[in-house]
Amino acid sequence: MSTCGSLENSDIQVQGAENGGTSQKGENPVDEGNVGETKSGDIKPAHMDEEPKKEEEEEEKAKLQASTLDDGVNISRIIERLAKEDPQSLAKIYSLMKSNNCLNFYPLLTPYHNIERIVDILIEENYEHENTWCVHCDAVFICQLLYEGFIPVASKQKVCRMVNNETKVVKECLLIPKIHYVRSCMHPSEIHISRKVKKKCKSYYITVDKDFDGVLQGIVEKHGQNWLYPFVQKEFKRIFEEQVTYKNVRMHSVELWCDGFLAAGEIGCTVGSIYTSLTGFQRKNCAGTIQLCALAKLLQHQQFDLWDLGMLLPYKKTIGSKEISMKDFFKMHRVFKHKTAPFRVPFQDKLNCGILINGTEDVRPEVNAEMHSE
């Protein structure tokens, strides 16, 4: 279900897109050449009036098929709505498609789509890629994507734009919501914890939602902006602070501390009893693994049913993550997102990772004393 054919077959002409936008259907005349005579035994060539008739039949067939689609997945109707209600975004869509041919082969998503139905279609078509794309990068739409099981990452693509009567190449922001043909997931109880982690974890504390900005800074410091561009950070922060809410989607930060130093952390989100790890960092050797192991125990303690780790990578497999097909993932996701699970450090604002990972035994005496004093 590529974007290319759907948009090019639309009758809408975009105001504001380069070169007057995309041509309307039927604008180019049909070439009419001389048709040879039919001889006995020869293949009969099409008559001059049969080609337009064939095109009309195909057009009517396409319209009939389109009329059976829900408005939430009918791209022609969505384009009509965009043209009336959000022409600036529609012009941006055409400009990006014109300058970046690869976008023609990925599904376009907008706030006007029925996202759940789009997922069903991708599963039915056995969609083997991981990318979709959209130009709407606001917090509300990001929440909607998270609720439906997408992992929204950001990108910047080159487009040509007229500036002071000169054509200039600029970079346009867009989202690349990931759907993943194979997902890395696990139940929190399936975590694999090494002896090294069990030994080192006693010196670390875990917190939740204590330093969102610090975690963002750590991620950019470690990985560069990568996909976490400033405009995405801004929208994530709005979701985190609940300036924007959508159903039960919540944005969180997880911090790992060592002697007051932020040693590792991640940004994640919860939807019902599902926790999704979005991106993270570490500043000390092994700190990232300790943070993940402590997080798994925290999720298990608070009865989360699914830990979504996104794309499968070797380190995720090492801690126990499994490969799950797109179909199976969304089957589980649509059940667990309607359940309830709290996400916080229990009983206090911070917790020693030795307590979470090893239990109350084999923890430094001062930690035991602290726990009993709470």
Could you tell me what each predicted segment is?
Residues 2-11, 25, 31-33, 39-374:
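N-acyltransferase acceptor-side catalytic subdomain
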Residues 20-21:
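Asparagine-rich low-complexity intrinsically disordered tracts
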